[in-house]
């Protein structure tokens, strides 16, 4: 089954925290608010910053803030950034693209279509919708 990693959970928690707060916050504050290991959160926040989702102030007490409006950040964007493209079946992962059953497989195409619909849904749910609890599925 399609499962998001703990890192993606933490990234979404941090992003929604910053969005709801409407201000900059440091790694320690976010980690304490959500009981996230601070070292892991620091790596996730750096990744989000490199991707342009956050801005950061330099220094040991550096603070992070959203770089974009919460209405323009999609859950799909965060999932792909942290976990890579989701896949319902192992054969849909880039590292498993060649499958010995491919010629006889009757489920790959339907699963690929389902996978595409899931990504389409995630690409249309924004951080703003998650924050206010109004994600329409």
Put a short name on every predicted segment:
Residues 67-134:
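Non-DNA-binding regulatory cores of transcription-related proteins
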Residues 32, 49-50:
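Alpha-helical residues within the helix-turn-helix
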Residues 2, 6, 10-36, 55, ...:
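N-terminal helix-turn-helix DNA-binding core of bacterial DNA-binding proteins
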Residues 39:
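Key DNA-contact positions within bacterial/archaeal DNA-binding proteins
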Residues 18, 44-49:
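Basic amphipathic alpha-helical segments that dock to polyanions
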Residues 51-67:
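Beta-hairpin "wing" of winged helix-turn-helix
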């Amino acid at each position: 089954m399609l499962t998001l990693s703990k890192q993606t959970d933490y990234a979404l928690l941090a992003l929604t925290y910053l969005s709801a707060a409407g201000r900059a916050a440091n790694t320690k504050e976010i980690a304490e608010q959500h009981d996230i290991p601070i070292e892991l959160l620091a790596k996730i926040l750096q990744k989000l910053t490199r991707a342009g989702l956050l801005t950061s102030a330099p220094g040991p007490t550096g603070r992070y803030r959203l770089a974009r409006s919460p209405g323009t950040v999609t859950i799909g964007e965060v999932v792909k950034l942290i976990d890579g493209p989701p896949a319902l079946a192992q054969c849909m992962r880039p590292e498993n693209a060649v499958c010995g059953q491919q010629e006889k497989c009757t489920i790959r195409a339907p699963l690929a279509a389902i996978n595409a619909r899931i990504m389409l849904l995630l690409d249309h749910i924004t951080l703003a919708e998650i924050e206010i609890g109004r994600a329409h599925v």
